[in-house]
């Protein structure tokens, strides 16, 4: 008998701007998608194509986020766990077991769950969740780039690259920036000194 399992993964823990995203995916027993692996190992074009196929073929999927404000109030780890719980709670189908990428399980899940280190390369449901979380996170960065092209979010996806840090210094901190992350926090502290 097939056990209905969900895979859960996150995207966007490290960037200096934007939400952290999590996805939960339940795949049908017969699901087969060649090339599906950890989203970080895929080109953006391949990820986007796979995301559409996953959404079409999954038994259930849901993408959730925790905002920069929630990241600031909870810290990035707890905000990530919150996004993961929201993703699981948003599934239209209730899984019997959950596999979560990493070494931690969100609190207050009422479904048996197991953390799997490097699960996005080992368990297909986690690989699928990895792709959906990453494409949702990238979509947020493209939308932010439309509103604030001078920051280059479409290129660096919010990570603390030289280009991003220079834009921060030149144009200032946006409401979407994570004020508790050191480069942003340090810049804000410098600005209050002058």
From Swiss-Prot:
Q: Does the keyword Chaperone apply?
A: no
Protein name per Swiss-Prot or TrEMBL: Ribonuclease HII
CDD domains (UniProt xref): RNase_HII_bacteria_HII_like (cd07182)
Q: Which domain of life is it from?
A: Bacteria
Q: Which reaction does it catalyse?
A: Endonucleolytic cleavage to 5'-phosphomonoester
In terms of InterPro entries, this protein maps to: RNase_HII, RNase_HII/HIII, RNase_HII/HIII_dom, RNaseH-like_sf, RNaseH_sf
The GO molecular function terms of this record are:
manganese ion binding; RNA binding; RNA-DNA hybrid ribonuclease activity
Q: Where in the cell is it found?
A: Cytoplasm
The cofactors it requires, by name, are: Mn(2+); Mg(2+)
One GO cellular component, as annotated? ribonuclease H2 complex
Q: Which organism is it from?
A: Neisseria meningitidis serogroup C (strain 053442)
Q: What class of enzyme is it?
A: hydrolase
Question: Which UniProt key words apply to this protein?
Answer: Cytoplasm, Endonuclease, Hydrolase, Manganese, Metal-binding, Nuclease
Manner of cofactor binding, per the entry note: Manganese or magnesium. Binds 1 divalent metal ion per monomer in the absence of substrate. May bind a second metal ion after substrate binding.
Give the UniProt record's GO annotations in the biological process aspect. DNA replication, removal of RNA primer; mismatch repair
Q: What is its main location?
A: cytoplasm
Q: Family membership, please give it.
A: Belongs to the RNase HII family.
Q: What does this protein do?
A: Endonuclease that specifically degrades the RNA of RNA-DNA hybrids.
Q: Does the keyword Metal-binding apply?
A: yes
Q: Which residues bind a divalent metal cation?
A: 9-10, 101
Q: Which residues form the RNase H type-2 domain?
A: 3-193
The UniProt record lists the EC number as 3.1.26.4
């Amino acid at each position: 008998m097939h056990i209905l399992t969900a895979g859960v993964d996150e995207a966007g823990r490290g960037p200096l701007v934007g939400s952290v995203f999590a996805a939960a995916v339940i795949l049908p027993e017969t699901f087969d998608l060649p090339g599906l692996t950890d989203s970080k190992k895929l080109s953006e074009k391949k990820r986007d194509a796979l995301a559409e196929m996953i959404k079409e073929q999954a038994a259930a999927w849901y993408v959730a986020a925790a905002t920069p404000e929630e990241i600031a109030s909870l810290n990035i780890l707890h905000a990530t766990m919150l996004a993961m719980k929201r993703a699981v709670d948003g599934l239209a189908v209730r899984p019997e077991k959950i596999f979560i990428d990493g070494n931690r399980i969100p609190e207050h899940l009422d479904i048996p769950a197991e953390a799997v280190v490097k699960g996005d390369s080992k368990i297909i449901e986690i690989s699928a969740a990895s792709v959906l979380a990453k494409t949702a996170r990238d979509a947020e960065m493209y939308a932010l780039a439309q509103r604030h092209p001078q920051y280059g979010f479409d290129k660096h996806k919010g990570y603390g690259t030289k280009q991003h840090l220079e834009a921060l210094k030149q144009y200032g901190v946006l409401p979407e920036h994570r004020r508790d992350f050191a480069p942003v926090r340090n810049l804000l502290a410098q600005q209050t000194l002058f």
